[in-house]
Amino acid sequence: MLLPKRVKYRRVHRGNMRGKAKRGTTVHFGEFGIQAQEASWITSRQIESARIAMTRYMKRGGKVWIKIFPHKPYTKKPLEVRMGSGKGAPEGWVAVVKPGKVMFEIAGVSEEIAREALRLASHKLPVKCKFVKREENGGDTNESN
């Protein structure tokens, strides 16, 4: 599972997830990807579960990029504990995902295999996802000399 090597603070505020993703909204490394359609916290366990679902379907073929990382700790108080008396102990790690963020990318497999692998991965995630392809018309591809 993914988690940071070290952090400056053990506990952080929850924050809010208003707005859309500013970066990471296009397929950059691979050929195909899944894009979040809504905002959510995605735990390191959910990321790992989605990765396993994809790689098993692809039978170790192709390459997978995970473009989200769980930097944010979330806390939980023990069961049957009264309110107050401080914030709970760190329970796990989450990645904050906003709408438009490309979470996983795949290359080296056909489109139908990639579509099915990413569909299986999206079932493991708590957000609605959309299949996206790499756009070849961007950048300096002007061929007029």
From Swiss-Prot:
Question: What CDD domains does the annotation carry?
Answer: Ribosomal_L16_L10e
Gene Ontology annotations for the cellular component aspect, listed alphabetically: cytosolic large ribosomal subunit
Its BP terms in the Gene Ontology are: translation
Q: Does the keyword Ubl conjugation apply?
A: no
InterPro entries per the UniProt record, alphabetical: Ribosomal_uL16, Ribosomal_uL16_bact-type, Ribosomal_uL16_CS, Ribosomal_uL16_dom, Ribosomal_uL16_sf
Pfam families linked: Ribosomal_L16 (PF00252)
Give the keywords, sorted: Ribonucleoprotein, Ribosomal protein, RNA-binding, rRNA-binding, tRNA-binding
Please give one Gene Ontology molecular function term for this protein.
rRNA binding
Which SUPFAM superfamilies does this one have?
Answer: Ribosomal protein L16p/L10e (SSF54686)
HAMAP family from the entry? Ribosomal_uL16 (MF_01342)
What's the subunit arrangement here? Part of the 50S ribosomal subunit.
Function of the molecule: Binds 23S rRNA and is also seen to make contacts with the A and possibly P site tRNAs.
Q: Which family does it belong to?
A: Belongs to the universal ribosomal protein uL16 family.
- For this entry, the protein name equals Large ribosomal subunit protein uL16
Species the sequence originates in: Exiguobacterium sibiricum (strain DSM 17290 / CCUG 55495 / CIP 109462 / JCM 13490 / 255-15)
The record's gene field reads rplP
